[in-house]
Amino acid sequence: MAKKILLVDDAAFMRKMIKDTLSKNGYTELFEAVDGADAVEKFSEIGPDLVIMDITMPNMDGLEALKAIRAKDSSANVVMCSAMGQESMVMGAVRSGAKDFIVKPFKPDRVLKTVSTILGNP
């Protein structure tokens, strides 16, 4: 069965970039959310195997959404990403249960390595 991946970013072009990278490499069950609140709702609906989520978003930021998702499912696989590669953000995400952290701008190889490490190959 194909692994489901939820892509969360308020910037449509960032979601598209990750989606294109993953779909070209065999990941086909890709879903999108536009902010943290949307991510929490879609997480409940879809039950994704992995969430790749931006930190800085309107309505509910990625760290709050991470906490809400982990409260629903303590074993949820969430990878945080942000242009802010600051240590405090990374540590906050890890303390809140993130499996990994990717810094923007993305390198496709880094995204694929992170996804395959967590989910295995498509």
Which functions belong to the PLM regions below?
Residues S88, F106-S116:
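C-terminal output helix
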Residues I46-I52:
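Active-site beta3 strand of CheY-like receiver
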Residues A12-F31:
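Two-component/phosphorelay signaling modules centered on CheY-like receiver
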Residues D35-D38, D61-E64:
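Acidic catalytic/metal-coordinating carboxylates
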Residues M84-G85:
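Short, conserved "switch-loop" micro-motifs in signal-transduction and mechanochemical regulators
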Residues M57:
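Receiver (REC) domain active-site loop signature in two-component systems and cognate sites
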